[in-house]
Curated annotation (Swiss-Prot):
Pfam families: Queuosine_synth. One of its GO terms (biological process) is tRNA wobble guanine modification. Belongs to the QueA family. Its EC number is 2.4.99.17. Transfers and isomerizes the ribose moiety from AdoMet to the 7-aminomethyl group of 7-deazaguanine (preQ1-tRNA) to give epoxyqueuosine (oQ-tRNA). The keyword Cell division does not apply. It comes from Cereibacter sphaeroides (strain ATCC 17025 / ATH 2.4.3) (Rhodobacter sphaeroides). It is found in: Cytoplasm. Keywords: Cytoplasm, Queuosine biosynthesis, S-adenosyl-L-methionine, Transferase. The gene is queA. One of its GO terms (molecular function) is S-adenosylmethionine:tRNA ribosyltransferase-isomerase activity. This is S-adenosylmethionine:tRNA ribosyltransferase-isomerase.
Length: 346
């Protein structure tokens, strides 16, 4: 299975740098079996069935992008930091730009209320230990940090105050992600309430999306690719809700690839169970889904592991046709773009 099998041409004009407003105004490509319909997210009330269960990732994105100053004698250097994940040894793993200007033991000052020491420096990243912890750290980070927009947006514009709302789901509650579960950005409270009134159930799980979600695949044989690990949890209550829906013949529909990867990780034994830990599950064509019946997701990058995931769900040829339709009909791509609802069979 070659990496080139998952390539496609995408006009740059289709890369969204701002989301649709309101959230539910985003377009929705409904693909069920061989059928494609051009709809909008607000139409989901008439698309989902009573008895369906949507699985939502309730992770909360932290303002992980920091700009600080390293002082060495009378010389000062501007340092850009992107937090990646909590480090096992304490502190945070982070990317630094320029990394070469930092030495272990040096301090980076981000604001009057927040500084960090370079505890370890590697070839590609470093470990920072901040001078605050707990709620004090959260408050200082909220003041000094900016939302960590994906590279394909950050290359086109800087993050601003509006991104603090736009790049966060309305049900975000557990802080720890450095990228949003973007399919969930399309939901607002009125849509959630309308779906619930129509008999659609919801289950929340937590997967802290890491910066590794944007890493490119560097091998031509995709089966040899190693996925980054991300921390997640499916509680006992969540597992029971999903199992009950399956037993009743309802559909389990993750909203986003992060929720899908998590519930499939929690179903390694064949049925879903409570689960907590790091997952590096890599889903590509040939994978047999255990609990997922359909998927709501945005449109993904060429040659990405997420494009491989949707190809596993729908079939490679079918996904090529779906993406060709999306490009021809000017759907907006990636994190702030439009959505698709992928339903195999039909």
């Amino acid at each position: 299975m070659k990496l080139s099998d998952f390539d496609f041409d995408l006009p740059e004009r289709l890369i969204a740098t701002r989301p649709a407003r309101p959230r539910t105004a985003a377009r929705l490509l409904l693909a069920e079996g061989d059928r494609i319909e051009d709809r909008h997210v607000r139409d989901l009330v008439g698309i989902f069935h009573p008895g369906d269960r949507l699985v939502l990732n309730n992770t909360r994105v932290i303002p992980a992008r920091l700009v600080g100053t390293r002082t060495r004698g009378e010389a000062c250097a501007k340092i850009e930091i992107t937090l990646m994940e909590p480090a096992a040894a304490g502190g945070w793993r982070a990317l630094a730009k320029p990394l070469r200007k930092l030495k272990e033991g040096e301090t980076i000052r981000f604001s009057d209320a927040l500084s960090a020491e370079v505890a370890e420096k590697g070839e590609t990243d470093l470990r920072l230990v901040f001078d605050r912890a707990g709620e004090d750290f959260d408050a200082a980070l909220a003041e000094a940090g900016a939302m960590p927009l994906p590279p394909y947006i950050a290359a086109r514009r800087a993050p601003d105050a509006q991104d603090r709302e736009d790049y966060q789901t309305v049900f975000a509650r557990h802080a720890g992600a450095v990228a949003a579960p973007t399919a969930s950005l399309h939901f607002d409270r009125p849509l959630l309430e309308a779906l619930a009134a129509n008999g659609v159930a919801f289950t929340e799980v937590t997967l802290h999306v890491g910066a590794g979600t944007f890493l490119p695949v560097k091998v031509e044989d995709v089966t040899t690719h190693r996925m980054h690990a991300e921390w997640g949890e499916v509680t006992e209550a969540a597992a029971a809700e999903i199992a009950a829906t399956k037993a009743a013949g309802g559909r389990v529909i993750p909203v986003g690839t992060t929720a899908l990867r998590l519930i499939e990780s929690a179903s390694a034994a064949g049925t879903i169970r409570p689960w907590r830990g790091e997952t590096d599950i890599f889903i590509y064509p040939g994978y047999r889904f255990r609990v997922t019946d359909a998927l709501m997701t945005n449109f993904h990058l060429p040659k990405s592991t997420l494009l491989m995931l949707v190809s596993a769900l729908m079939g490679e040829a079918r996904i090529r046709a779906i993406y060709d339709h999306a490009v021809r009909h000017d759907y907006r791509f990636f994190s702030y773009g439009d959505a698709s609802l992928l339903i195999p069979g039909g």
